[in-house]
A protein has these predicted regions:
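Structural signature of the two symmetry-related core transmembrane helices
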Residues: 81-95, 276-291
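Helix-loop boundary and gating motifs at the non-cytosolic
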Residues: 9-59, 212-219, 223-240, 244-250
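Juxtamembrane intracellular "pre-TM" segments in multi-pass secondary transporters
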Residues: 3-13, 187-219
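Helix-to-loop junctions at the C-terminal end of transmembrane segments
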Residues: 65-78, 161-162, 261-273, 360-361
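A membrane-interface helix-boundary motif in multi-pass transporters
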Residues: 159-175, 357-377
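Hydrophobic core of transmembrane alpha-helices in multi-pass small-molecule transporters
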Residues: 24, 93, 103-121, 220, ...
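Cytoplasmic helix-loop-helix junction between adjacent transmembrane helices
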Residues: 111-145
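Multi-pass alpha-helical transporter architecture, strongest
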Residues: 97-98, 179-191, 371-395
């Protein structure tokens, strides 16, 4: 092996290691903010209605953000630059939270943070796919570190909440975001990729295809169903007597189940249609929410509901990525992903957060809130059940 080839191999290995670290920190941050933001806001004295409204405002930023950043990355070809800029602006906007003492001040800070935060993952995925292809590596071995980071931070912050104030999630997030920003500064720039004007012009024709529209409607309904879980699950467990450590372990259990299903997802996708799998995932998600609301005091039910995260999120995510990859032309993957994130997670997530916040009533209507989520998940499944055989063209 020549000296130049040896250096290239070493640089490639270093970049893959940095990508592992970046995934660990990115999803580690999600492991702090997603489960424990409600705890932080409750500690600040906000009502369940206000918590739901703030979650909705934050989530709305995901409607505009992904498409904006995807367009900038597509047109400039500077994927890494967009990723790094997103991380820097995320840290700056998140830091303002420490000086905010009002509802709208926090809403502005969190909303700006989420707007910049949406620049990170889509670009990270592009860089990773290009890097593993050139290095002959495997995407799964890199992405696995994201799940590890989520588990580590979720459990650690859960334990810390047993001993410290409800501001712990904010301090942990600030440290994690800063470390993430630093890690991205050492990543390598991928090759510039540009789509032609003709390719860009075909995009809206592609996304108006009935199969894509059905996919977006169902995905949006499913994300509406997650509103109660994302906004109030940790508060629900606290009210049921679970400690912070136990809550962290239960959330981590869901991520472990998610990792396991990722291992078998491709075999399932090869055997069954995407529509059929997503319909089954919708039914199981409805069962998860209804059981959690009706029998949340049972340890077995709570553990079982977390294991169903393998289908609610894991298989659903794998099937959704598979659909976008196979239904859309390669030069539309980034923007297709942006549409999916923006509408399903942005509009759907915000709607679910707001409605569940209005229903929750400091936990008095927990059953009603989870029942609402179960109905939304069933509607998601129904959309696919109706159209799966007639109009679904992807496996």
């Amino acid at each position: 092996m020549s000296h130049s080839n040896h250096c290239e191999t070493r640089a490639s290995s270093t970049n893959l290691a940095l990508l592992c670290l970046t995934y660990l920190l990115y999803f580690g941050q999600l492991g702090v903010l997603v489960p424990y933001l409600g705890i932080f806001l409750d500690g600040r004295g906000y009502s369940s209605e206000q918590i739901g409204e703030l979650f909705a405002i934050i989530t709305l930023a995901r409607i505009v953000g992904p498409s904006l950043w995807a367009t900038i990355a597509d047109k400039s070809g500077k994927t890494l630059g967009v990723l790094q800029l997103g991380c820097v602006l995320t840290v700056i906007s998140f830091a303002t939270i420490f000086w905010q003492n009002t509802f709208w001040g926090l809403a502005l800070s969190f909303g700006m943070m989420m707007m910049f935060w949406t620049a990170v993952l889509p670009q990270l995925e592009v860089i990773t796919m290009q890097s593993v292809k050139s290095a002959g590596s495997n995407y799964g071995t890199i992405r696995l570190w994201g799940s590890i980071g989520f588990i580590l931070l979720t459990v650690s912050v859960g334990q810390a909440l047993d001993f410290f104030t409800t501001d712990v999630p904010i301090y942990a997030s600030m440290i994690t975001l800063t470390a993430l920003m630093i890690s991205t500064l050492f990543l390598s720039q991928p090759d510039k990729l540009n789509a032609s004007e003709e390719q860009r012009g075909d995009f809206f024709k592609v996304v108006k295809h009935p199969a894509f529209v059905i996919f977006i409607i169902s995905a949006t309904l499913l994300q509406v169903s997650f509103g109660t879980y994302y906004g109030f699950f940790t508060l629900y467990l606290r009210d049921l007597g679970y400690s912070g450590q136990q809550t962290g372990l239960l959330i981590a259990l869901g991520v472990v189940a998610e990792v396991v299903i990722f291992i078998y997802a491709q075999k399932l996708l090869n055997r069954y249609s995407v529509g059929s799998l997503l319909a089954v995932c919708g039914v199981l998600t409805a069962l998860r929410w209804y059981a959690l609301g009706g029998w949340g005091s049972s340890d077995i039910v709570v553990i079982g509901s977390q294991l169903l995260h393998a289908f609610s999120f894991g298989l659903t995510h794998a099937a959704s990525v598979h659909f976008i990859h196979h239904h859309l032309p390669a030069h539309f993957h980034s923007r297709g992903q942006a549409i999916y994130i923006g509408i399903a997670f942005g509009l759907g997530g915000a709607s679910g957060n707001y409605v569940s916040g209005q229903i929750w009533q400091q936990g008095l209507n927990a059953y009603e809130a989870f029942t609402f989520s179960a109905v939304m998940a069933l509607l998601s499944a129904l959309v696919f059940a109706i159209f799966s055989y007639k109009k679904w063209h992807s496996k």
